[in-house]
């Protein structure tokens, strides 16, 4: 730990807020930059919240002048795959161009470390459905491409500047803070676990199964679900790695185990204790049939040891959070 400040962009959002909470619990100095378009003021449990956009050069200049920032954790982004297919320029503008502006100001301020929120969507459709960090990148939607372009920027900038980074490629994030303080609260979210749990508590009429004819055992898409608590811990481990002098690197964040849509929904029904309304729909644009992590490298590089690798635990914490939201116990 240092006396410097960590800037967390998008720190009022789902994943960012869990990282901010863990940073605060570790005694780190934190400032959050979030425009609150999908984040929530009350989700920021530690540090100061500055309301602003990552692509706003004037806002960034003031922020870097005010705080002694040596690390940036960059989460701020649009993340909805179907929307990125329908409106790609929105994603290139907010995800890629805004990241360029952020990097420019970070370099001017002498930032030494960046931990970047990337995505497994950069892999597109791997030949066998599994992806290691050496799997060729071939995104099939603008969301994945916008994140990959930011990875390229980081790579090229770090090659000629005293800045090192870790890019973490997330697989499917789910679950919520076991303490019940924060969780996925975005209205009209598309994350399957959240949608299914909303059906359980009655805030959504049904959950859609997009595609039942994939080349998978039960015909539905297969994904690697990672608990948000373990993902947040990976960011703290990445920061510790960089502080030890670790070289810039890119790492998968997943458990290395896949569950189909039907398997996940069966677990939701098991935890809820009753069936939920489901609707079979055509495939959704930009969705690969199977995407599972090969995740040995992150464990070796960072010493990361997941503590929540349990689908029942992921679903249980998700459902507990949705019940809290439905009861009105967490308001914006």
Regions found by a protein language model. Give the residues of each.
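C-terminal substrate-binding subdomain of Rossmann-fold SDR/epimerase-dehydratase oxidoreductases
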Residues: 193-195, 201-332
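N-terminal Rossmann-like NAD(P)+-binding domain of SDR-like oxidoreductases, especially those catalyzing
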Residues: 1-173
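Oxidoreductase cofactor-interface core, primarily capturing Rossmann-like NAD(P)-dependent enzymes
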Residues: 163, 178-179, 205-209
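Short-chain dehydrogenase/reductase
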Residues: 92, 140-148, 182-194, 224-225
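Active-site/binding-pocket entry motifs
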Residues: 56, 174-176, 206, 215-216
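A short acidic, helix-capping loop that chelates divalent metal ions and anchors anionic groups
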Residues: 81-84, 176-182, 217-219
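Glycine-centered small-residue hotspots that permit tight backbone geometry or close packing
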Residues: 11, 39-41, 52, 82, ...
């Amino acid at each position: 730990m240092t006396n410097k400040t960590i800037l967390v962009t998008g720190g009022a959002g789902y994943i960012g807020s869990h990282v901010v909470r863990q940073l605060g619990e570790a005694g780190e100095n934190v400032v959050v930059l979030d425009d609150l378009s999908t984040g929530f003021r009350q989700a920021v449990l530690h540090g100061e919240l500055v309301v602003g956009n990552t692509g706003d050069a004037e806002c960034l200049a003031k922020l870097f002048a005010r705080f002694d920032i040596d690390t940036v954790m960059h989460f701020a982004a649009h993340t909805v795959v179907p929307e990125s297919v329908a409106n790609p320029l929105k994603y290139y503008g907010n995800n890629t161009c805004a990241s360029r502006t952020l990097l420019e100001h970070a370099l001017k301020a002498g930032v030494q470390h960046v931990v970047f929120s990337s995505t497994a969507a950069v892999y597109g459709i791997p030949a066998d459905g599994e992806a290691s960090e050496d799997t060729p990148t071939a995104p099939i939607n603008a969301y994945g491409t916008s994140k990959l372009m930011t990875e390229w920027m980081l790579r090229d900038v770090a090659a000629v500047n005293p800045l090192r980074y870790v890019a973490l490629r997330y697989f499917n994030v789910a679950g919520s803070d076991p303490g019940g303080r924060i969780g996925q609260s975005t209205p009209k979210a598309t994350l399957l676990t959240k949608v299914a749990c909303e059906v359980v508590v009655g805030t959504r009429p049904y959950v859609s199964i997009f595609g039942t004819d994939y080349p998978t055992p039960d015909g539905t898409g297969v994904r690697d679900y990672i608990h948000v608590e373990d993902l947040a811990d990976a960011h703290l481990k990445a920061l510790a790695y960089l502080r030890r002098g670790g070289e810039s690197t890119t790492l998968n964040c997943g458990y290395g185990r896949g569950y189909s849509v039907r398997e996940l929904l069966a677990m939701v029904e098991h935890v809820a204790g009753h069936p939920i309304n489901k609707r079979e729909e055509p495939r959704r644009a930009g969705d690969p049939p199977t995407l599972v992590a090969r995740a040995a490298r992150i464990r070796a590089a960072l010493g990361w040891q997941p503590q929540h690798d349990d689908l029942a635990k992921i679903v249980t914490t998700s459902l507990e959070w949705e019940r809290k939201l439905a009861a009105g116990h967490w308001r914006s």
